[in-house]
Amino acid sequence: MSAKTEILRNIREALGTRAPDTPIEREYRQAPALTQADRITLFTDRLQDYNATVYRTASVPEAIAEALRARVKRGLLIPPAFPPQWLPAGFDFTRDDGLTYDVIDHSEGALTACTAAIALTGTIILSHSAHEGRRALTLIPDYHLCIVRVDQLADTVPEGIRALAGCRTSPITTISGPSATADIEMIRVKGVHGPRTLDVIILEDVIIWEEP
């Protein structure tokens, strides 16, 4: 028996019978009470702080077309099960059905959905479902256009993590703005660990799809 254990035992014996534990009431607020409008505004502000461009819309095809025209892009790579009704006419979209890394690297970028997003930190979470694509699709290209539905938007990090309850065996990627890093001399470089440019479409109409 260690000296610490013996000392604590002697203290407990000296105190006599231990009183029953008293439960602590947890009536304090554990998360911000945001309205949906406040949540969207906070998420948008955080993304813009990260130099991401945000589009709020009820029409995904129109927002995608607007983003591609603004970036002067002719088309993007998309995950295998990306909803076809979201794709605007007049652009070239290539489904990733096993594209080589070289093809992905030389593409104009990727268009994906997401699993969840966190308003407080401006973070997008990917679990790489068939609507989001494999990790290479959102790490190799220089441009990422991501769609976030309002019903996927959580207030805080714990709430966002709870949205991953069914994704315990999936690889998880968290995105807080375009990729950037700094060395010991604080020289900031973009695009080292992922896309240099991030655009986000916030879909204000809730659309539920089924996993293939």
What is each of the regions a protein language model found here?
Residues 1-212:
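The feature marks the mature, well-folded catalytic cores of soluble enzymes
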